[in-house]
Amino acid sequence: MSQAPNPVPWRDPRRVPRSRRESSIVSGVEEGRVAYANVRKVVFLLVSTGAAEIVLFLLAVATRSPLPLLPVQLLWLNLVTNGIQDVALAFEPSEGGEMRRPPRSPREPVFDRVMLLRTAASALTMGVAAFAAFHVAIGAGWELDRARNGVLLMMVLLENVQAGNSRSETTALLRLSPLRNPLLLVGTL
C-alpha cells in the first residue's frame, strides 16, 4: 500500500529545515542561560540575607548585647522577605545579551568568587547597619522590645533593597525598572 506524500514537510523530523532547527537550539540555549542567571540571583539573595542575619547575631554575642531579634521575629522576617521574593526573583526576565556572553565552563560553580565577595560585602553592610541601629536605640534609652521592633523593620527594609539589588549582577539597582518584574514588585510591597 502506498502512502501519499506529506504535504507539510516540517511535520517529518527528518525533513525539518535546518534554519528552524538551529533557531530552536539557539533559543533553548538562551533560555538555559536566563534560567542559570536566575538561579544565581536567588542563591545570592538567600545567602546574603541569611549571612546578614548571622552577622547581626554574632555582633550581639561578641559584644554581650541582648539578642537584637527574638526567634519568632527572625522566623517572621524570613517568611516575609525570603519566602516571597526568592520565588518572584526566579521569574526575572532576561537582561538581554545572554548570547553575547561566552559560554561558562561546566566546572564553574554557581557560587563563584565574585558572588562570594558581593555576598560578604552586602551581608556585612546589612548586619553591621542593623546592629548599629540596635545599639544606638538601646543607648538612646529605648525599651528592648521597641529596639527589637526597630531592628526588625530595618532588616525587612534592607532585605527588600537586597532583593532589588539581586536582580542583576552587572546593572545597578536604580537603573533597573521595577516594572520589569511585577511579581517581585508585589512581593516586596
Residue locations for each model-derived region?
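C-terminal substrate/ligand-recognition segments
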Residues: 189
